[in-house]
């Protein structure tokens, strides 16, 4: 019953005597005479897996994959990805990256012809393809069979200028109709707006545009789809991770993974002070909630079980020893430790990192080194893009393997990045992380949330959703907060680092609230560089931190972007992976912020006093 604890205790006594998909698309359900693209692709993948050898699967290109599809499958992939109705005859104009070459595969097959000119948007060359359609239902196809590239958008031009165009029954339900003009946000799932548009032929200016979902660009990906994980699950627990889904003072959530043969789990836990006694107290037990996670495209590890426990009724400010397992003698993890949040205002420290995403082995060296350098941190914030392929489990396996020994001792506090949102929905992320469910009504629980630790409150937001959908909740949460220190955590930055990137919707809906309720810092990611702004209020530099908010962008992985000089940048650097430690000191109400590189060298620092 207390096997793991007893084994370790006995060993310690002798020594003393001797000296861790499927994505589900949300929104309006598919309606039509054919199966959805999602169901069709699932059927294709299942057939490929059962009838084609691993060697052929890994060598398959787009041409080969297309040749293996049935006429019905080709028709669905060419016409059922995006559908809508128009009330007047229109010219549909597909705007896509020139680098896509012969993609989408259906473009020429269906009679679209090039318009004969190209322009550059956000540093990417795009071209235009057109075809006339009559009144009624119009269906457009998938972005590609290979994945990658940005999703196309579709402009609509009435064939008769004097007619008024109405677009109805738009599917998927998340898509929206916009206008081809300066400031257009071409994708509903990305906040970046187009910069000032170059001169367009007059006939294109102001056209209605179907704003698409960029993360659906991989919906029909059939190439390089099958993987092997480098870290397959075993019977023994691994990927042990701490999070919070309740009050950090009195609860602790624990998640872990096992192979398919282990179908149940539990946690044994005891106060560290009781464990260290000459006659240790018996550990308590809490049963886990277990679910099967299946990934057909993971060839060597398609099924695992994931287990979640939330321990309640803990004492504030108390260290605990725990182990996870299935109850068998040899089915326990090594002992680990967590500490609950203090029940009163006390000084504390926490770590913050931007995108890990790429080069997870190198990132692992950073997070391990950071924890060795600052083992006193209470928890670790990650501002999105923890992995590159958020709905492919082998990427998460690498993430958890690289962070082993850290996130089983210190809770991780994640925000959702665009890469967790792979395929248009962060399904695997939501399955893996047990987080507070106190976010805005009308959006999925755990995508936005808030929690308090000592005299600080943290507001975690999702920039893949609309800013408007979280603004009312955010204001209520900020207004109700009595914390001395306030931090926002989200992925896409309000003040960008990367050239030609901008996220005006964040500044429209969120930063006025940060100004009104005096947010101290916004902890961001996405731009793969390091940037710290001057204190900002009303979108202007102000004299000191007592008047404005400091916005940080950082990256902890190995993917880097260039950085533009910006009038709001107080300090910036590129090609540097960093971790940040924030020390909140009660004496003098002081925040000491420091940024370190992979060698532990101090690269930036700031002190805020209240």
What name fits each language-model region?
Residues 130-144:
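Noncatalytic modules at the cell exterior or secretory-pathway interfaces
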Residues 322, 358-364, 388-392, 418-425, ...:
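Active-site environment of divalent metal-dependent phosphoester hydrolases
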Residues 308-310, 319-337, 395-482, 509, ...:
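Extended active-site neighborhood of metal-dependent phosphoesterases/phosphodiesterases
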Residues 164-351, 577, 583, 587-610:
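Acidic, histidine-bearing metal-coordination/catalytic regions of metal-dependent phosphoesterases
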Residues 484-524, 541-544:
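Active-site-proximal segments of metal-dependent phosphoesterases and phosphodiesterases across multiple
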Residues 364-422, 516:
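Core catalytic region of metal-dependent phosphoesterases/phosphodiesterases
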Residues 80-82, 90-92, 250-254:
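Structural beta-strand segments of beta-rich domains
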Residues 352-354, 379-385, 411-418, 461-462, ...:
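Active-site neighborhood of phospho(di)ester-bond hydrolases with catalytic His/Asp-centered motifs
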